[in-house]
UniProtKB/Swiss-Prot annotation:
It comes from the Bacteria. This is Acetyl-coenzyme A carboxylase carboxyl transferase subunit alpha. Its EC number is 2.1.3.15. Keywords: ATP-binding, Cytoplasm, Fatty acid biosynthesis, Fatty acid metabolism, Lipid biosynthesis, Lipid metabolism, Nucleotide-binding, Transferase. Its main location: cytoplasm. One of its GO terms (biological process) is malonyl-CoA biosynthetic process. The lineage of its organism: Bacteria, Pseudomonadati, Pseudomonadota, Gammaproteobacteria, Enterobacterales. The gene is accA. It comes from Yersinia pestis. Component of the acetyl coenzyme A carboxylase (ACC) complex. First, biotin carboxylase catalyzes the carboxylation of biotin on its carrier protein (BCCP) and then the CO(2) group is transferred by the carboxyltransferase to acetyl-CoA to form malonyl-CoA. It is found in: Cytoplasm. Disulfide bonds: none annotated.
């Protein structure tokens, strides 16, 4: 799988290109008098060291780029790597089935759960089919239908957040985009089952919040959560999207910053270089966090669960 190196990773890309070149030469002619294995190993160690150095001092804008990485794991990738017996459920029973939201029943270590998440696409056709991960009102109404089903059957709800934002098209507005988001916020705040939310990529404004009200809210290390994109903020404040790096720093969109502000509960570490480098490793870390969160919530009765969730919402903004 291509790593699709970002701009700030170019020194790493150059080293990896040298490694690939030497490896290819070694495979083509095994009779070479020069032993390339030691040189390849040296370069690999240097690449790891350089990656560790670069990733130890990332800015908010660089993290935003990682959150949007084209090879980053999406909701369906985590479903495949963490859960078993997934059965997708479709449609909002009112208008259509929005492919930007996926959801269904699955098992987490044998325990039945309801999973709901944003889904982006990788190839052009899939991106269009998924509307680039931007749900329409019917997507949020589908999500709510599944949440209400989970409440009826006493299933914990697990959501995965990864969207640039709710779709802002005319049709979406005509079908009640803001109403759908607002209704989800209200209903999620009073569902009588545990809700664990995790930002796995972009957490874009109301489009993220519509499946983001929970008893536990986590973020992957290189994910972001914000009321507007850095480019959008820069365009408003500085009249230029070129100021996006400055806006990203000012907005405090990173997982560690939001943890400091008590907006989220946990930051889930990613493999060196980001989640796209090792799907299996990030799945193991995320699964462990989900199991720990559900264990914490299982000891609460319905009244305690709702009171705690209410207090959580009321405390937002107080550090």
């Amino acid at each position: 799988m291509s790593l699709n190196f970002l701009d700030f990773e170019q020194p790493i890309a150059e080293l990896e290109a040298k490694i690939d070149s030497l490896t290819a030469v070694s495979r083509q002619d095994e009779k070479l008098d020069i032993n390339l294995d030691e040189e390849v190993q040296r370069l690999r160690e240097k690449s790891v060291e350089l990656t560790r150095k670069i990733f130890s001092d990332l800015g908010a804008w660089q993290i935003a780029q990682l959150a949007r990485h084209p090879r980053r794991p999406y909701t369906l990738d985590y479903i495949a790597n963490i859960f078993t017996d997934f059965e997708e459920l479709a449609g909002d029973r009112a208008y259509a089935d929005d492919k930007a939201i996926v959801g269904g029943i699955a098992r987490l270590d044998g325990r039945p759960v309801m999973i709901i998440g944003h889904q982006k696409g990788r190839e052009t056709k899939e991106k269009i089919r998924r509307n680039f991960g931007m749900p329409a009102p019917e997507g949020y109404r589908k999500a709510l239908r599944l949440m209400e089903m989970a409440e009826r059957f006493k299933l914990p709800i697990i959501t995965f957040i990864d969207t640039p934002g709710a779709y802002p098209g005319v049709g979406a507005e005509e079908r009640g985009q803001s109403e759908a988001i607002a209704r989800n916020l209200r209903e999620m705040s009073r569902l009588n089952v545990p809700i664990v939310c995790t930002v796995i990529g972009e957490g874009g404004s109301g489009g993220a919040l519509a499946i983001g009200v929970g008893d536990k809210v986590n973020m992957l290390q290189y994910s972001t959560y914000s009321v507007i994109s850095p480019e959008g903020c820069a365009s408003i404040l500085w009249k230029s999207a070129d100021k996006a790096p400055l806006a990203a720093e000012a907005m405090g969109i990173t997982a560690h910053r939001l943890k400091e502000l008590k907006m989220i509960d946990s930051v889930i570490p990613e493999p060196l270089g980001g989640a796209h480098r090792d799907y299996a490793a990030i799945a193991i870390s995320l699964k462990a966090q989900l199991l720990a969160d559900l264990n914490d919530l299982d000891v609460l009765n319905d009244e305690e669960l709702l009171n705690r969730r209410y207090q959580r919402l009321m405390n937002y903004g107080y550090c």
